[in-house]
Amino acid sequence: MANKTNSADDSYETPSGPSIKVRNLRVNYGEREILHSISFEVPAGETMVILGGSGSGKSTLLRTLVGLEKPTAGEIWMGDKNFAALTDAERDTLRKKMGMSFQGGALFGAMTVGENVALPLHEHTNLEQSTIEIMVRLKLDQVGLSGFENYMPAQLSGGMKKRAAIARAMAMDPEILFFDEPSAGLDPIIAAGIDELILKVKKVYRITIVVVTH
């Protein structure tokens, strides 16, 4: 597994996202060791791309970083908090500052695009519906899907589903964004557009981003 960090041209601006520090991370499934002594650091406001082939453990690493898997050993620092050592309640609070775009988009097929984007806002805030609707339109506009609030996911192309998933990941104005195979299954031109969108999000919001890809 390899990784690299990309520096932004506007690095003189103060980043809003925290740094991520992973120290000697191990994840076992029974007797099988999936991750062995993984260590890396993502500076605040920077982007790291984690590269690995199928079965290399990169998706397990991502799930562990967002708290969906518990590490067998090691530390995961998000700013000044060791995410791996927090209680479930503390982890849930910190997770609200994260956005996650899953492979394939993971949109709920029975909900409209707007309802999908609004879901985190309904679950984690007490905002009025009118305010949520404004925020949904704003997020969709930012990813190039203005006017698609009432579309169903089945009506979208693969690239549009990815954009809608990014809008949902951005709904809570996260400090950290995680992407799992954001351009998987897309043709090169559409994939390049998704990559450009991720770079745009990073430049505009100066947040910390981790991308897993192959």
Give the positions of each predicted feature:
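Conserved ABC ATPase signature
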Residues: M152-L156, M160
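Helix-to-loop junction immediately C-terminal to a conserved catalytic motif
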Residues: V66
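Conserved ABC ATPase "signature" region
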Residues: K81-N82, Q129-F148, L199
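Conserved catalytic motifs of ABC-family nucleotide-binding domains
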Residues: D173
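Catalytic Walker B motif of ABC-type/P-loop ATPase nucleotide-binding domains
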Residues: L177-D180
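Helix N-cap at the start of a conserved alpha-helix in ABC-type nucleotide-binding domains
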Residues: P188-I190
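Short coil-to-helix segment of the ABC ATPase nucleotide-binding domain corresponding to the Q-loop/switch region
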Residues: M111-L119
